[in-house]
Amino acid sequence: MQILTGTAKFDNASFQFLHKTIDVFGSVVLVEGCDPTRSITWVHAWTVTDGVITQVREYFNTSLTVTRFGKSDISSITTLHCPSVWESSLPNRVGKSVPGLVLAL
């Protein structure tokens, strides 16, 4: 956990997590950031239960889009509505092409 918060004591060659944004969607916390030279971008998706991080998903140099499943009536067959609620912004700023991924909440 000290590495994630940036409080660990390491030499200068170690990776530094510099967060740029923190957003919350229900029990999921999204933290986006980059390294000091902005050559590596990352997104952490933490699932928090009763104040405890119970799951961590980590994405490096990936453009992440978060969607939320819409509610639908079970008795009818309709197109599933999955609106985008969050998109990573840092990969576009560092000027490189990265793979894209959708995280469904």
UniProtKB/Swiss-Prot annotation:
List the Pfam families hit by this protein, alphabetically.
WI12
Coiled-coil stretches noted in the UniProt entry, renumbered to this chain? none
Tissues with expression: Ubiquitous.
Enumerate the transmembrane spans. Answer: none
Briefly describe its induction: Mechanical wounding induces a rapid increase of this protein. In leaves, this increase is inhibited by the addition of osmotically active agents.
Highest rank taxon of the organism? Eukaryota
UniProt cross-references to InterPro entries, sorted A to Z: NTF2-like_dom_sf, Wound-induced_1/12_sub, Wun1-like
The entry assigns this protein to a family as follows: To potato anionic peroxidase.
Task: Indicate what this protein is called per its UniProt record.
Answer: Wound-induced protein 1
- Protein's gene: WUN1
